[in-house]
């Protein structure tokens, strides 16, 4: 019994190793820079060189000022969007996106209608026409 379990465990490990290695791409082993240059499809000299330039204090301050302006404009835009007070809903109606099973009253929004799905098990008030 223990021998069969050992064989099955070994087989399982072998299969896991085999499937992991079968999905990996084959590796190309390059021995020196000459073979790298001859085997590469992209010539490294085609790309422009990158130059790193140190920033002076003035350019750093301008960058900070621009970032602060962007932050303040975002804050002002979020403050300007104040939620308008909702009109109080009258009792004998159902709000939009709420459940409106057939014994329930009609939808409060005049453009909304009660739409049922799954054999009238899930019903909700939905606005169907945007031009209303």
UniProtKB/Swiss-Prot annotation:
Per the record, where are the segments of Basic and acidic residues compositional bias?
Answer: 63-79
The keyword Ribonucleoprotein belongs to this UniProt entry's keyword annotation: no
State the UniProt keywords alphabetically: Disulfide bond, Glycoprotein, Knottin, Secreted, Signal
A single Gene Ontology CC annotation of this entry is:
extracellular space
Give start-end of the signal peptide.
Answer: 1-22
Which residues are connected by disulfide bridges in this protein? 93-108, 100-114, 107-125, 111-132, 116-123
Question: Principal localization?
Answer: secreted
Q: Agouti domain spans which residues?
A: 93-132
Residues with attached carbohydrate = 39
The region called Disordered is annotated at 61-87
Going by the entry's taxonomy, the superkingdom of the source organism is recorded as Eukaryota
- Keyword Disulfide bond in the entry? The reply is yes
**GO MF annotations in UniProt:** melanocortin receptor binding; neuropeptide hormone activity
**One GO BP:** melanosome organization
Q: Where in the cell is it found?
A: Secreted
- Functional description taken from the UniProt entry: Involved in the regulation of melanogenesis. The binding of ASP to MC1R precludes alpha-MSH initiated signaling and thus blocks production of cAMP, leading to a down-regulation of eumelanogenesis (brown/black pigment) and thus increasing synthesis of pheomelanin (yellow/red pigment).
Tell what the record comments on domains: The presence of a 'disulfide through disulfide knot' structurally defines this protein as a knottin.
* Entry protein name: Agouti-signaling protein
Tell me which species this is from: Gorilla gorilla gorilla (Western lowland gorilla)
Gene name, per UniProt, is: ASIP
């Amino acid at each position: 019994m223990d021998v069969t379990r050992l064989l099955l465990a070994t087989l399982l490990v072998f299969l896991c190793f085999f499937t992991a290695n079968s999905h990996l791409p084959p590796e190309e082993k390059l021995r020196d820079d000459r073979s790298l240059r001859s085997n590469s499809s992209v010539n490294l000299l085609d790309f422009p060189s990158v130059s790193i330039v140190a920033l002076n204090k003035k350019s750093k301050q301008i960058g900070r000022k621009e970032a602060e302006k962007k932050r303040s404009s975002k804050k002002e835009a979020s403050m300007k969007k104040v939620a308008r007070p909702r009109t109080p809903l009258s009792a004998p109606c159902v709000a939009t996106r709420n459940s409106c099973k057939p014994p329930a009253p009609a939808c409060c929004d005049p453009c909304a209608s009660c739409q049922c799905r799954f054999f009238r098990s899930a019903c909700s008030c939905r606005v169907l026409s945007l031009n209303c």
